[in-house]
Amino acid sequence: MARKFNSLAFIASPAEEAQKAAEDLRAVYGDHDPDKADVIVALGGDGFMLHTLHRTMNTGKLVYGMNRGSVGFLMNRYSTENLHQRIANADENAFHPLEMRTTDVNGDKFTALAINEVYLFRQSYQAAKLKVMVDGKTRLDELTCDGLLLATPAGSTAYNLSAHGPILPLEAPLLALTPVSPFRPRRWRGALLPNHVTVDIEILEADKRPVNAVADHQEVKSVVHVRIAESEKLTARILSDPDHSWSDRILAEQFSN
């Protein structure tokens, strides 16, 4: 049975095309305060959708995106017609973000959330050296690489795919641990981990080989330790058209040229 939503809130990226779309949709459907609306309609590209999901994770709000950007992997097709019906018939995907806890060279601590991935990368011309632990057990004593990332199924088609990591079905209870340009160990190309594990990464020779850490768009410089785990307290909820579902998009990506 289709759900019924009475109120929509339209938010748009600063791009002219997105702003114009918001004006057109408000003229047809009205507009509500995002805090009080049943559904938030995000207009823009994938970056804006990520930003919107970060804003709504602690509220449980449903987000329906329409592409007014470039790639639009996370977005639905843009149209001003039958929007209430499209949203009522949409499939819902709900997932927990990753929580990144960092300690930097000064001992300062910082926490950030990631829907796509948490990644570490070398800050200088020298390769990073990392010690990798999973649930307290050391799995790699020393990984020499340009970087390392932990991706969710939702983020597995983004940076993770560019780094030759595996694409994960959206419903898979897995995380992809993927190295970026690994040098040693020679044959290690990553691992699939259960989504309930805690991953600790210790930066070796941090003063000589500085490393930054990023959770989606939030960057912390010169870290010495990073802990990553799924945050079960927060949930991102996204709606997709049945004929262009998120799961189908991820499947199609595995057969693209």
UniProtKB/Swiss-Prot annotation:
Q: Where are the transmembrane segments?
A: none
Q: Which residues form the active site?
A: 46
**GO biological process annotation, one example:** NAD metabolic process
Enzyme nomenclature, EC number: 2.7.1.23
Q: Which GO terms describe its molecular function?
A: ATP binding; metal ion binding; NAD binding; NAD+ kinase activity
Tagged with keyword Transferase: yes
Cofactor(s) this protein requires? a divalent metal cation
Q: What is its subcellular localisation?
A: Cytoplasm
Specify where it is mainly localized.
cytoplasm
SUPFAM superfamilies assigned: NAD kinase/diacylglycerol kinase-like
Kindly list the GO CC terms recorded for this protein.
cytoplasm
Its keywords, alphabetically, are: ATP-binding, Cytoplasm, Kinase, NAD, NADP, Nucleotide-binding, Transferase
Q: Which domain of life is it from?
A: Bacteria
Annotated NAD(+) binding lies at 46-47, 51, 116-117, 146, 154, 157-162, 218
> What does the sequence similarity comment in the record state about its family?
Belongs to the NAD kinase family.
Tell me what this protein is called. NAD kinase
The record lists the lineage as: Bacteria, Pseudomonadati, Pseudomonadota, Alphaproteobacteria, Hyphomicrobiales
Q: Which gene encodes it?
A: nadK
